[in-house]
Amino acid sequence: MNKEQLQQMRQAPGFVGALDQSGGSTPKALKAYGIQPDAYQSEEEMFDLIHQMRTRMITSPAFATGKIIGVILFERTMRGKIEGMPTADFLWEKRHIVPFLKVDKGLQDEANGVQLMKPFPELGKLCEEAVGYHVFGTKMRSVIKQANEQGIRDIVEQQFQWGKEILSHGLVPILEPEVDIHCPEKAKAEEILKRELLAQLDKMTEPVMLKITIPTVDNFYKEIIEHPMMLRVVALSGGYSREQANELLSRNHGVIASFSRALVEGLSVQQTDAEFNAMLEASIEDVYQASIK
């Protein structure tokens, strides 16, 4: 594990960019960027286009301001290159950004008010590959739809079970038990989640990271942020607009952003490089300001 990267993730001001759209969410991301579905004929072409968009973002001067401390990548992006260098190496060596890899394979159908991650027996193999690409950590998402005690316990147990396997490969996991912002008893679900997370953290011997939905009650996750086994807590934008997500985030001290959609809002394939860079820089500045409050 890279000690300098560990220090950066523990205490550097800034936020984590999420560029980990997978097959399912890529058409939506491309459409928002101004590329219609009829512009590509195959999955291969679709992934090439999204890689071009990500390359444009990562190579933009806006990405070199030191305000983004980490970036979450999709598998294909990790295996790809930017300006002739493997993506993770380019991020760290040219941008001083810590690379993470999305490792889940999507969600199971809802049961007990939650969606667990699909089983993934190849997790260890993917972790080894990530280590070979000089990736620092991972991220995996499951979703809480209802304030169901059993379901939430299952979610947290699965996240920590995967997390321990990931740690055994020398990678730092970002656990992401997202609470759906439309959950009818969101505050209650968060109470159960916090209790289960603290119970698991108390049993850990190596620190992990956590990605959460911005809580209903400001500063609700304070004990988790201060827990010795918690490296850093980041927040997802979860369907809120960038303005709304930034506003909510700025009220939660010690939590930094890990936004994807809110980061690319307003970017377009039609923009000149100057327009694109200015828009991206403004987005990064907004998210950064909300993260350091």
Swiss-Prot record:
This is Fructose-bisphosphate aldolase class 1. GO terms for molecular function: fructose-bisphosphate aldolase activity. It catalyses: beta-D-fructose 1,6-bisphosphate = D-glyceraldehyde 3-phosphate + dihydroxyacetone phosphate. The gene is fda. CDD domains: FBP_aldolase_I_bact. Keywords: Glycolysis, Lyase, Schiff base. It comes from the Bacteria. The active site is at residues 176, 211. Pathway: Carbohydrate degradation; glycolysis; D-glyceraldehyde 3-phosphate and glycerone phosphate from D-glucose: step 4/4. Belongs to the class I fructose-bisphosphate aldolase family. The keyword Lyase applies. InterPro entries: Aldolase_TIM, FBA_I, FBA_I_Gram+-type. GO terms for biological process: glycolytic process. Its EC number is 4.1.2.13. Pfam families: Glycolytic.
